[in-house]
Structures are given as C-alpha cells and as structure tokens.
Design a protein with these regions (language model features):
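Alpha-solenoid helical repeat scaffolds
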Residues: 37-40, 54, 74-75, 127, ...
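Residue-level signature for tetratricopeptide repeat
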Residues: 58-59, 111-112, 137-141, 174-178, ...
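Structural motif corresponding to the intra-repeat A-B loop/turn of tetratricopeptide repeats
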Residues: 63, 116, 145, 182, ...
Length: 758
C-alpha cells in the first residue's frame, strides 16, 4: 500500500479501514468467535490500525476472546506511551497524571482481566498511577477476596467527582456484577433502572432500546433480575409487555434471540407457553454449539465459561420433553427417575460461581412447580371421569417436591459457604428454615441437615470475625447442634452422625484457637464466660489455661465419638461416601492430635494441658489407615510419621510396622529419600518392611537414593545398629543392576574428571 499510494492517500485508506472495522464490531449481534478473533488479529498485527478500547472490551467478553483482546489493548497502551506527544519530560514523569486516553485504555484492559477473574493482574494495574480513584482499587481487592458485600458498599459509596466516565461505568458494571454474585435480584433491578426516565409515572423500559449504553450494560442484568423475581412469584405485567413489544420489532427481536434465548425460554415456561420455550431452548443450544466450535481448544478458560450454561440448558430441554409427554403423569415413576437424574449431577462447587448454582437450583424449583401443577390437573381430570385408576397422591407428591426444594436450597447454602459467600448462604438458610417449619411441619431429617449446614456456615464465618464475635458465633453453632443431638437419625445414619460430631469438634476448636489470642479472655464479659463453662459442664473457672484445656478435652472426646461411629461399619464400606466419612474423621482426629503435639514441641504457652501420651500412636495409626483407603492428604502427611517415630520410639514403632503393611507400597515411593535417611538410626526397623517391599516391586526407584545415602551411613557397635547395617547390605544385594552401576560410575567420572587421572 505504501508503494502504490501517497502518504495522504495511505492515511485516508487506513482511516477508512479502521472505521469499517469499528463499524463491524459495533453492528455485530452474534459476536461469532472466529470473526471477532480475525478482526482483532488484523489490528494487532497491523500497527497503524486500532479499535476503540471500549468496543474491544465488549466484543472480547461477548465472544469469550479475552486473550486476544488483552493483547490488543496492551499493545495500544504501549503505542500511546511511545507517542512523542504523550511522553512527559523528565521533570514531569514522577508527577504528571496519565492522559485521558491512557486511563481509559487501562480501565478497559482491567475489565477484560476481571472477566477472567485474574485479580492478581488487576491488583497490579490499580496499584500503579493510572489516573483512577483509590476506592476503585479497594473495591476490586474486596471482590478478589470474594467479599462482594464490602465491594458493593465501596462501589456504591464512590463519588463521581473528577472520575472519568469510563471509571464511573466500571463502578456501575461492578455493582451489577456484585449483585449477581450475591443473588440480590431486587437490588440489581434497582441499579439498572436508577437512571431510566419515567413516563406517566411508570419507568420507561423502552429507553433500554433507545440508549446504546443502556442496551449493552443494563438490559442483560434487567432481564436476568426480572426473570429471577418472576421465578420467586413476583409477577410484573409491565416487564412482560416490554418483552412482548420487543419481540414484535425485528431488530429488537433479533438482538434478544441472539443473546438471551435462555431467558426467553424460561419466561415462556413461567407462562406455560411450552412450544415457544422449546423453540428458544433449541435456538440457545444451537448457538452454544456454534460458539463452541469457534473456541480454540487451547482457550481453556473460555471453554470452561462457555460450558457453565450447558447444565441449565440441558435440564430445561429435559423438562420440556417431560412436560409434553402425557404418559409421564399417569404414575410418579417417571418423575422419580427425572429427580434422580438431576440429583446425580450438579455444577462444580469450586469452579462454578454461586450465581451459576442459583440458575440451576432456581430453574429446578420452577420445573417442580410446573410438574406438580400438571399432576393436579391430571388428577382432577381423572376424578371428574370417575376413573378407578387415579392412584396418584398429589399431597404426598407436593410434600416430596417441597423436600427437594429445601435440599436444593441447602445445597446452594453449602456451596456458598465453601466459596466464602456468606450472605447468600445465610439467605438460603433463612428461606429453607421457613419451608421446613411452615410447609414440612419440622421434618426431622431436613432439620438435622439444616442444622449441619448452619453450623458449617458459622464455623467458616469465625475465621473472618473479631475474637469476641467469633466465640459467640461458635457457641451459637454448638447450641444449635445440641438441639438435635437426641434425634434417632443421628444413630441410624452413620454418615449424618459422623458429620454431627465433626462439626461440633470444629466449633470447639475454633473457640480454643480464639481464646489463645492475647487479650481475648480478659475482654470476655461474664455471660460469655458462663456460656463457655456450660460447654464442658465445668465449675467456675477464671484461669485461661484450664478453660482451654477443658474445651480441648471436650473436642477430643467428640472426635473420638465421630471416629467410633465411622469405624463401626468399617467392614461394610460399600459406598464412596462412607469411605470418605471414615477417612475424614480419621484425618480430623490426626490433625487435632498433631497440632497439639507441635504446640508441645514448640513449648507454646497456649498448649492445652492434656495427657498426650496416646497422640503419637493415634497420628501414626490413623494416617496409615487413611493411606490404605487411598487418601491423598494422608499420603502427604507420611514424613511427619517418620519424625514421630524418631521423637517417640517404643510401641509407636511397632504400630508403624503393623499398619504400614496394610498400605500398598507404591504409596511410599514419594518418600523413599526420607526413609533411606533413617537406615543408620535406631528407629530404622520401622521402615525395613516398606523398603523390602519397594526393593521387590520397584527396585529402580530405590537404587539411586540408596547408592547416594549408603556412603554417608555411620553404624555403631550396638546390636541394633549392626542389625541395621546387615539390613542395608542385604537390601543393596537385592538391587543388582550392572548396567546402571556402570552408568553411575560414568556419571561420577563426569562430575569429578580429575579423579580418573589420579
């Protein structure tokens, strides 16, 4: 181009191309990944072309092509900084604020990193001087920690002042994102409509179409919030009319169908229009397949994000297939099969955020309501025809569905607790408790499940609370657990009984840990001290060490109960859940004992005054037993057993030898070096059996560590030491690999070539 055109013509041509590219990005409805990636690659490779930073962010997030968008914006930032008109003088470099264009590009870049949840990079961006307010960095840090409540508060407090419009837009988007993570749908709706004008005293929703910014930023969240509230029973005719009118306009209809087919499908399900719902579900699945085919296999984060919506879509399709088949409503067997299928699959508790879980669980509740309504209609029809085949108990079915809804809610609370999203967990617990008490007449099984979820939430919350509040919260959890301790289900269901005692022990441990913080005991009032005394049924105690010791003793005995219950069915561990509960109880007891042993070894002042003679043996036996059940945590703890064998010789060595024989020898391969290092010690007989098995089954894994360590061994003249020496010689004799010996000699010569000539 430079050869055929003058400079002016070339500049005009580049300007036309750049305008055309920006126009293509602006007018795109589908954000087809290959097309978006192609345009961005052209701009990245051709230095004279650039796209608007805001448009790069929008299309990159919409097409899940964040990596190329990040590269493009970073290159544009470098280009701006290299512009002679942008570079400050030496005197200005330390004080001058960046230009408006630079700040805008940095903020748009931060949006891309935020969309892939790379908060480490975000922290780096906002820790430098990019022309933004300090409160933006503080709010983003809170988001990165998962503290969406604090982040929402900070974003809401931020004042526009001297902030650029792009930073204000970042605050608006972040407020909506925090509302989504906290499932605050009414707050989300309020934030979407705060700047929308009113018409005849009613919010003018049509402004969402007239204003391009509103359409891109507010419309997606408005649709989501209104639909979620519709699912919970809040009917809004104005919103439904808005959707109906929008679908009559060809451009608006195309926009909604391309981007929000899943929401449209759910809306029509809520209105019992299953044919239109089926159409939009099929459209959504087709769009998913097209987008998936356009994502490179190396873009793991984008593919993972794309997959997050698949379960909700699949279950929507299953529901529509189920509801359209009249044969499914003659008996409850098909419904039972559907519920089992749903119960067997769920989003990942760690990879999928709470709002994804909320989508799945809320949709399931809607489907159950619709299925129950269809059963009621079928039952009434059969009754009106005086049919003798009407054997469906709709009241019992409604009760079962209500139990499922409570279990969905409690599962969501568990996931939210695991993701440190405590406000969502608390709200789900409140909703489920209302259903248990009012609709299910205090169902005992669900009451225990609710109590365990509540106690788990309180234990996790204690980690971020002030000492006094943490103690009060832990005591509240223990009191709630004690309310259900006499229910028969705890004795009949081993898994439930184990979890009950583990949660109580965890709450007691929380109290002892908090009491160990300097100044906590002195700041407690008399009522709180009385509550602590009631935990272990002790007398009035004013000495901190006695209180800690008593509570630690109570925690230990509680763990013993958990282990006893878990081991009571050890010979019949058929399910993975029962094996998992056994390993969990064993490792919890192990960690408890090991923590106190370490405090004692360190001469810590806050070490509880307990008889710890049994603790080394408990750690050794329980770790090795957990290893026999293929516990990864136990395998990683094995070196600690070798240390305990050295520190506590005697009967513990015999326990080590006996229990280690039940563990597959391959599980010890990672720790061969540590075991070989013990061979000239008195306690080496503990690992003789393990090393013999390794020499028999995996000799090459043992060869190098033994060859290296053998030169450093020093054996004394005692009987035990001579026996150890004989064992080493016998072990070395079994590892006969002439070719490997020659290789080792050759490697030694390479390492010390001067030795060859001496």
């Amino acid at each position: 181009m430079d050869e055929n055109l003058t400079d002016t013509q070339a500049e005009e041509t580049f300007r036309d191309i750049q305008g055309a590219l920006n126009n293509m990005m602006t007018s795109s409805l589908q954000y087809f990944p290959p097309f978006i990636s192609c345009v961005q690659n052209v701009c990245y490779n051709e230095g004279k072309l650039s796209l608007e930073a805001g448009k790069v962010t929008t299309i990159s997030i919409g097409s899940l092509q964040q990596p190329i968008g990040i590269m493009l914006l970073e290159k544009q930032i470098l280009r701006i900084s290299e512009d002679p008109g942008e570079r400050p003088t030496k005197r200005q470099r330390t004080s001058a604020s960046p230009s408006r264009e630079t700040t805008t590009t940095w903020i748009e870049l931060s949006k891309l990193y935020k969309s892939i949840e790379d908060f480490d990079v975000l922290r780096g961006i906002f820790s430098s001087q990019i022309g933004t307010q300090a409160i933006t960095r503080q709010a983003l840090e809170a988001e990165g920690r998962g503290d969406y409540t604090k982040a929402l508060k900070l974003y809401s407090q931020s004042s526009e002042g001297d902030a650029l419009q792009v930073e204000v837009d970042l605050w608006d988007d972040s407020i909506l994102e925090c509302c989504k993570r906290l499932t605050l749908w009414d707050k989300m709706e309020e934030s979407c409509l705060v700047d929308v004008d009113e018409k005849d005293g009613v919010v003018d929703l049509d402004q969402m179409w007239r204003d391009e910014y509103f359409k891109e930023h507010y419309l997606p969240f408005l649709l989501r919030s209104k639909t979620k509230q519709f699912c919970s029973g809040k009917h809004d005719d104005q919103f439904l009319n808005f959707i109906s009118n929008s679908l009559k306009d060809e451009q608006q209809k195309a926009y909604l169908e391309n981007k929000f087919s899943d929401i449209l499908a759910l809306l029509f399900i809520l209105q019992d229009d299953y044919d239109r719902a089926r159409y939009y579900t099929g459209s959504c699945l087709q769009t998913f397949l097209e987008d998936w085919s356009g994502l490179d296999s190396m873009m793991t984060s984008s593919r993972s994000a794309q997959l997050q919506s698949l379960q909700a879509l699949t279950e929507m399709q299953e529901f529509l297939d189920f509801i359209s088949n009249e044969g499914n409503f003659s008996t409850t067997s098909s419904t039972t099969s559907l519920l089992k299928r749903w119960s067997s699959r769920e989003p990942d508790p760690k990879l999928h955020s709470v709002d994804i879980w909320d989508d799945v669980m809320t949709n399931r509740s809607v489907y159950l309501d619709k299925i129950l309504l269809k059963f009621n209609k079928s039952s009434q029809l059969l009754n009106s025809e005086d049919s003798m085949d009407c054997s469906i108990n709709t009241e019992q079915l409604e009760n079962n569905f209500m139990k499922k809804r409570v279990m969905f809610s409690l599962r969501l609370a568990e996931v939210a607790t695991g993701q440190v999203n405590f406000p969502v967990a608390k709200r789900q617990l409140q909703n489920s408790l209302h259903l248990i008490r009012d609709r299910l007449k205090n169902d005992r099984e669900l009451e225990i499940l609710w109590t365990h979820t509540y106690s788990d939430l309180n234990c996790k919350k204690c980690l971020i609370l002030a000492p006094l509040e943490a103690i009060d919260t832990a005591i509240s959890a223990i009191e709630q657990l004690d309310k259900v301790k006499d229910i028969k289900l705890l004795q009949e269901d081993l898994s439930t009984g184990v979890r009950h005692h583990l949660l109580k022990s965890s709450s007691l441990d929380t109290i002892t840990n908090v009491l160990g913080i300097n100044g906590t005991w002195d700041s407690l009032d008399s009522s709180l001290k009385e509550k602590l005394r009631a935990l272990y049924f002790g007398k009035q105690a004013d000495q901190l060490d006695k209180v800690i010791s008593q509570i630690a003793t109570k925690s230990f005995t509680t763990l013993q109960l958990a282990v006893k219950i878990a081991q009571s069915n050890e010979n019949n561990l058929k399910t993975s859940d029962s094996r998992k509960k056994l390993v969990t109880s064993l490792m919890t007891m192990t960690n408890f004992c090991d923590r106190l042993l370490r405090l004692k070894e360190e001469d810590n002042e806050q070490t509880p005054k307990l008889d710890m003679k049994m603790f080394p043996g408990i750690v050794i036996r329980y770790v090795l037993k957990s290893m026999s059940y293929e516990s990864t945590e136990a395998r990683q703890k094995f070196p600690r057993l070798l240390q305990l064998v050295e520190l506590h010789p005697g009967s513990d060595v015999e326990a080590f030898k006996r229990k280690s024989s039940d563990v597959p020898c391959w599980m010890f391969i990672s720790w061969i070096n540590q075991m070989v290092a013990l061979l000239d010690k008195r306690e080496s007989r503990a690992v003789h059996g393990i090393l013999e098995d390794l020499a028999k089954h995996y000799p090459q894994a043992l060869l190098y560590p033994l060859k290296i360590s053998r030169e450093q061994f020093k054996f004394g003249g005692s009987i035990e030491e001579q026996e150890n020496k004989q064992f080493v010689e016998r072990l070395n004799g079994t590892l006969s690999f002439p070719m490997l010996d020659d290789l080792i000699i050759a490697l030694e010569q390479l390492t010390n070539p001067d030795m060859v000539f001496k």
